[in-house]
Amino acid sequence: MKHIEIYTDGSCLNNPGFGGWAYILRYKEYQKEGFGAEANTTNNRMELMAIIESLKALKEPCEISLFTDSNLMVQSINEWLEGWIKKDFKGKKNIDLWKEYIKVAKSHKIKAFWVKAHNGHLENERCDTLAREAALKIARENDEKH
């Protein structure tokens, strides 16, 4: 099983509001970036969307070290998700995305790690920039329509 590093970030201009997500996949010297945006979303949805989209980009089962500045994502993936499944997500938010995460994550071995935001962590800073730019772009496009 290949060992992949994934770095993710989500951004929301107002919470809720225009949001963006981004990821960096790294395998040895290979690196791939991805990003996107939504018009009406939250920061937590964008954090989770970055993770989901990064996993969709993988072509085979992998062992993954996932790095995010969202403590909620780290704890959800490493600790809480199994309990949520057993309780059928009762009282939880973003159930649609968590169910999608489960579907795209099931073939991988994933361990999530927290990195401090805005602390000079190169990949986290890059994801932050990409996610924020995606959110700003969709906000500008929306302004132009109105």
UniProtKB/Swiss-Prot annotation:
Question: Can you quote a single GO CC term?
Answer: cytoplasm
Major localization class: cytoplasm
Q: Where does Mg(2+) 2 bind?
A: D9, D128
Q: Which UniProt keywords apply?
A: Cytoplasm, Endonuclease, Hydrolase, Magnesium, Metal-binding, Nuclease
User: Where does the record place it?
Assistant: Cytoplasm
Q: Supply the Gene3D superfamilies for this chain.
A: Ribonuclease H-like superfamily/Ribonuclease H
Major enzyme class: hydrolase
Subunit structure and binding partners:
Monomer.
Q: PANTHER family, per this entry? A: RIBONUCLEASE H1 (PTHR10642:SF26)
Q: What does this protein do?
A: Endonuclease that specifically degrades the RNA of RNA-DNA hybrids.
Which protein is depicted? Ribonuclease HI
Biological source species: Campylobacter jejuni subsp. jejuni serotype O:2 (strain ATCC 700819 / NCTC 11168)
